């Protein structure tokens, strides 16, 4: 397996694939998608600024995907940007013939896999962090596992959760709902999950300190030692 770090402006990813050619295909697709989005934002800057659902005015495919997913979750389109870019990259890998490919875009993961895949949990100072992993079954079509945190990383959040991970067949949907739920979940209260019915989300897990809240169909969680050196990171210029 090849593991590649790839950064293009604020898009900072780790790509896993069996062949270098598939990594290059993913890079090209993500660059093109990001450039399409940048050109659109240049003529419609409100798309980037709003924290509420927004309908693009003749936007490119990436903007439409982001807005559609975010609208369902009740958040602004940029809440789905990382998952959408990752999904576009993995989709390109699949069309090129890859049966296995993973793109981790800052904790928002799109993937296809022909084998069980372990995904480690990093949740900041939570006692669970770095000690547990999800075991995802094979996924022949593009799938999303996206995480949002109020205590880790630079992303804007109005919540308190150390990590909220969402599973969905559409990574854009997983990303948008991870953001929305991270804004809403609170210790000892699980009502934030009530809005997930019919959303396209398969399952969700919220970690708040030592508390774990679950909803829907969640892959098995097993003990693991998560190598923090493998967490996607980079420098922004």
UniProtKB/Swiss-Prot annotation:
Gene3D superfamilies per the UniProt record, alphabetical: ApbE-like domains
Superkingdom assignment: Archaea
Stretches that traverse the bilayer: none
Matches recorded under HAMAP family: UPF0280
Family: Belongs to the UPF0280 family.
NCBIfam families linked to this entry: PRK04334.1-4
The protein's name in its UniProt record: UPF0280 protein Mpal_1292
């Amino acid at each position: 397996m090849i593991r590649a770090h790839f950064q293009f402006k604020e898009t900072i990813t780790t790509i896993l694939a069996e062949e270098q050619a598939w990594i290059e295909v993913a890079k090209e697709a993500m660059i093109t998608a990001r450039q399409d989005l940048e050109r659109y934002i240049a003529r419609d800057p409100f798309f980037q600024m709003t924290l509420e659902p927004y309908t693009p005015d003749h936007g490119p495919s990436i903007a439409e995907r982001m807005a559609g997913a975010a609208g369902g979750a009740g958040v602004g389109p940029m809440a789905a940007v990382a998952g959408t870019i990752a999904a576009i990259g993995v989709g390109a890998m699949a069309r090129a013939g890859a049966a296995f490919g993973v793109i981790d875009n800052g904790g928002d993961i799109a993937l296809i896999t022909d084998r069980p895949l372990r995904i480690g949990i990093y949740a900041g100072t939570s006692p669970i962090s770095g000690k547990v992993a999800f075991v995802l079954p094979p996924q022949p079509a593009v799938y999303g596992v996206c995480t949002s945190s109020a205590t880790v990383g630079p992303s804007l959040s109005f919540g308190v959760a150390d990590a909220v991970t969402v599973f969905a067949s559409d990574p854009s949907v997983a990303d948008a709902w991870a953001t929305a739920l991270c804004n809403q979940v609170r210790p000892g209260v699980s009502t934030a999950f009530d809005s997930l019915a019919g959303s396209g989300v398969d399952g969700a897990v919220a970690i708040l300190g030592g508390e774990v809240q679950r909803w829907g169909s969640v892959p098995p969680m097993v003990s693991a030692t998560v190598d923090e050196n493998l967490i996607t990171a980079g420098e922004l210029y």
